[in-house]
């Protein structure tokens, strides 16, 4: 069970996202975004690190987090299985939220506006704001921090931060795109986790799912 502080923090994060969204939409952060993007994308570019950050940006979202969910469910105890289910629900909500935001608001990606942008991966055609990668990985990291032991959650948080940074490094997002996505991902994760973990219907569904899973394994003579 999560305390009301979890819900309050989630709401605060969502409000902060709305402020970031307004600042970006009205162009208040444009100069900051251009300067910091150029500093990271060009000024901090190191050829020997390009492969690492390209890999992080290409494989750090679904190719990383789907196996995490599967491992938690297959090999974890009851709490880890519960975390896996919460992650699935949070990810579904975040995907829908991200797609809706990108459909309703368009911001050109950096290489379309900045001639000096160094693009290291193919450029998507959808809106730059918010970063879908940051949205998903930070949502996953926050659920992990809430529900898993630190020896698991802290490496997952580190992975999420690396992916967020990589989106600027490879040239596909402005800093505020990433910050907005990360803040929204955290806010939604906190709010949804609070609701689920305090809802008897979720616990009943989870217990039923675990029983069904164990029965299937038993019939297959795997346990």
Please provide the spans of the model-predicted regions:
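N-terminal transmembrane-helix/juxtamembrane module of multi-pass inner/ER membrane proteins
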Residues: 1-64, 102-126, 218-223
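Membrane-embedded catalytic cores of phosphoryl/pyrophosphoryl-handling enzymes
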Residues: 3, 118-223
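Alpha-helical transmembrane segments of integral membrane proteins
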Residues: 8-13, 81-90, 152-155, 176, ...
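Alpha-helical transmembrane spans of integral membrane proteins, capturing the lipid-embedded, hydrophobic core
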Residues: 14-18, 66, 87, 91-95, ...
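Aromatic-anchored segments of alpha-helical transmembrane domains
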Residues: 18-23, 92-99, 159-172
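Membrane-helix interface segments
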Residues: 48, 63, 78-83, 148-155
